[in-house]
């Protein structure tokens, strides 16, 4: 690595911090589904940062290619989740997790 370039440890620390924020967001937020989806996306982003960091460190492009597949699946998951949420909001006029839990029957 050149002088002034971030090291592998810096990327792994960034990934760990983002993953921790995502976990806290999932466990502390039990009310709003949109924030819950954003926290899950943050978890996926942290995993992607770690994959790219290890891929670059090892000199192998497989991790970077795998990240593109993960981002594609994450985008599809977010689009489907938001579409379901919009349909639910139009019917129930609420996006609270507690209200969605009442759908069990």
UniProtKB/Swiss-Prot annotation:
Tell me where it resides. Answer: Cell inner membrane
In the UniProt record, does the keyword Metal-binding occur?
Answer: no
**Annotated transmembrane regions:** 8-28, 34-54, 65-85
HAMAP family to which the protein is assigned, alphabetical: NDH1_NuoK
What family is this protein classified in? Belongs to the complex I subunit 4L family.
Q: What does this protein do?
A: NDH-1 shuttles electrons from NADH, via FMN and iron-sulfur (Fe-S) centers, to quinones in the respiratory chain. The immediate electron acceptor for the enzyme in this species is believed to be ubiquinone. Couples the redox reaction to proton translocation (for every two electrons transferred, four hydrogen ions are translocated across the cytoplasmic membrane), and thus conserves the redox energy in a proton gradient.
Protein name, entry field: NADH-quinone oxidoreductase subunit K
The organism is: Acidithiobacillus ferrooxidans (strain ATCC 23270 / DSM 14882 / CIP 104768 / NCIMB 8455) (Ferrobacillus ferrooxidans (strain ATCC 23270))
Q: What would be the name of the gene that encodes this protein?
A: nuoK
